[in-house]
Amino acid sequence: MATEVRAQLAERSLPSPKGELKLEKKSGCQPRSHGDSGPQKELMIPGIVDFKLIREAVRTSKPQTPSAYRFGRLSHHSFFSRHHPQPQHVTHIQDLTGKPVCVVRDELSLPTISVPVGDPQSNRDPRLYSEAWKKELKDLASRVAIFTKESELKSKEKEEPQREQGAKYSAETGRLIPASTWAMARRHSHQGRNQPASRDEGDQTFVLQDQELLILELLSQILQTDSLNAIQFWLLYAPAKEKDMALGLLQTAVAQLLPQPLVPIPAEKLLNQLLEVQDSLQERHQLPYSQSPKKMKTPPLSKSEKPENIGKAQVLRVHSSQNPEEKAAKAEG
């Protein structure tokens, strides 16, 4: 019993925290005097840590010093970096008299552009774009030219066996050339064409330029545009299938523009024409030396001019109509 009584007395003697809180609240509710203008600190409960108050205390800014900026911090603009003293860019050197002279290193004050504006590759080589589309156009023109040459060679190979059976007619000389001599002449002409390759290089460049212009014009018709930029963009970025389709159209168009091969003439018809030409040439050569048959008509001969038949021979007496006196005068003279 004694121990229980002592425990109860000890509990009554200790002040309860609830009672203290009530007293603190009552004291906080009392009206403030007009003289207390300073901020009142909040009462802290022992054993309890308020993290919100700690964060707010950390966030509170330090009191500004007199050297702080009046209207906030200055920006990093080149004007402020130039007109605000900076020890990194401002130094002092001595002049001839030994006095310090202020020197400003403003190379780093202004912003510099290290990378060119726009596409760096186009700025490094401005002709890159033009050379690229010209190369594509040249490749397209060469493919079309190769196709046309192959088609011409195939057509010639088909025609040559039929023509080489008979003789060839030369329009320059107007004569027939045998097949053997024609083949030899063709071989010599092919060898001569292969040898002067350096002379034909200039002509080939002109031909290639003409082909490129022709293909450029045909492309404008195929793509249905008059804009050179659109054609350049198509040459650079068009897919392979689309280019193949355009190549087929270009090949057919160029094949139609090329002159068609001559139709071969049959051998019999050619010989008849040659005979007619030769006859007409012979008549033209004979006309100056001999008169035509219409002009050959002469008046009938007189009896004195007609030849006399003596046996099987015909004898013509010359000057038979002259008098004997005239004959004697001629003899004396």
Curated annotation (Swiss-Prot):
<dbReference type="Pfam" id="PF15256">
    <property type="entry name" value="SPATIAL"/>
</dbReference>
<dbReference type="InterPro" id="IPR037394">
    <property type="entry name" value="TBATA-like"/>
</dbReference>
<keyword id="KW-0217">Developmental protein</keyword>
<feature type="region of interest" description="Disordered">
    <location>
        <begin position="1"/>
        <end position="42"/>
    </location>
</feature>
<keyword id="KW-0963">Cytoplasm</keyword>
<feature type="region of interest" description="Disordered">
    <location>
        <begin position="284"/>
        <end position="333"/>
    </location>
</feature>
<feature type="compositionally biased region" description="Basic and acidic residues">
    <location>
        <begin position="324"/>
        <end position="333"/>
    </location>
</feature>
<dbReference type="GO" id="GO:0005829">
    <property type="term" value="C:cytosol"/>
</dbReference>
<keyword id="KW-0221">Differentiation</keyword>
<comment type="function">
    <text>May play a role in spermatid differentiation. Modulates thymic stromal cell proliferation and thymus function.</text>
</comment>
<dbReference type="GO" id="GO:0030154">
    <property type="term" value="P:cell differentiation"/>
</dbReference>
<comment type="similarity">
    <text>Belongs to the TBATA family.</text>
</comment>
<keyword id="KW-0744">Spermatogenesis</keyword>
<protein>
    <recommendedName>
        <fullName>Protein TBATA</fullName>
    </recommendedName>
</protein>
<dbReference type="GO" id="GO:0007283">
    <property type="term" value="P:spermatogenesis"/>
</dbReference>
